[in-house]
Structures are given as C-alpha cells and as structure tokens.
A protein has these predicted regions:
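Short functional hotspots at interaction and active-site rims
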Residues: 1-165
C-alpha cells in the first residue's frame, strides 16, 4: 500500500501538480518539565498538573518545504472546524490543480470538505494507514515544538510568523 501511494504521488509530482500536505498538531500552553529529582531508588513525583493550562491546536498545509498556511484553534479539531478551515483558509490560497494529502483521521472524511476540494478542481489523497512518516509536515511540527521549547515565552502565532519553518 505504501509503495503504491508513493508511486501515485510521484506520478502527480512528475506531471507538475503541486503537492499539499495537511496535518494538525497540539501545542501545550505550558511546557512540562523534562527532569526531576528524587532520592536514589525512589520515583520522582510532581504535584503540578501540567495539562491544566490547556492547549492550542494547529492545522497547517505544507507546500514544498514551507508552510502555506497555519491556523490556530483553542478548541479540539472536529469535522466542522476542519471543513471550515479547508473552505475559508486553505482553498483560497492554493494554486490550481493541487494534490491534497492528509491522514485518515475521522474528521478528514467529511462529505462537505471532499465536495469543496473536488469543486475547486483539486485531488484529495489519503495517506496509507499508520504512515505519518510519509507526511513531511510531521517534521515541521517537530521543528516548531523544538523552537518553542528553546523560546518558552514565544506565542504560537508569533512562532509561525517569524520563524522559517
């Protein structure tokens, strides 16, 4: 399945169609500690609830090696939010005849979203199951999280505006 997917994607690239990779990622508002201290042989326990401050979810589209668009949401991503993002943010920014690639998340399968993509004359392709390694945007999310760890006070919208991710 993976080989067939790569072969088909390569055919689209050779025909000159832009390939757009889409994915979402969550960013914690407060970065958890990675180290702690305890007596030798004892487990290290923390009393701070690191998840209590919430998280921001990002949806992005990657063309080549750069983000075409990134949108931030305080809510969990669902079919309605994703469909509206595709319609209002992604599609107006795409060049004609793109191949849009995304994973098989449930909210990526909305009928309205599929129809919007088809009506805009783009091709929708889903990654093979359990194949995040075939989606280069995953590496961009990892880069963004690394930069954020180094610069803890940077806001997410600023992070995506000023960095060359």
């Amino acid at each position: 399945m993976r080989r067939i997917f790569r072969w088909r994607l390569d055919r689209h690239k050779k025909s000159g169609k832009p390939i757009v990779f889409i994915d979402e990622s969550g960013f914690a508002h407060d970065m958890p500690r990675t180290h702690g201290y305890a007596l030798k042989g004892k487990r290290c326990y923390g009393i701070h609830d690191w998840g209590a401050k919430g998280r921001t979810n990002a949806i992005g589209a990657l063309v080549g090696k750069a983000f075409l668009t990134v949108a931030l949401f305080s809510a969990n991503i669902n079919t309605d939010i994703f469909t509206q993002w595709v319609k209002q943010d992604l599609l107006p920014k795409l060049p004609p005849g793109c191949v849009i690639v995304m994973d098989n998340a449930t909210f990526h399968k909305g009928k309205d979203m599929k129809k919007d993509i088809k009506n805009a004359n783009h091709i929708l392709k889903y990654l093979p199951p359990y194949s995040p390694d075939l989606n280069p945007i995953e590496k961009k999310w990892a880069q963004a999280k690394t930069v954020r760890k180094k610069h803890k006070n940077i806001e997410l919208d600023t992070l995506f505006k000023i960095t060359k991710l």
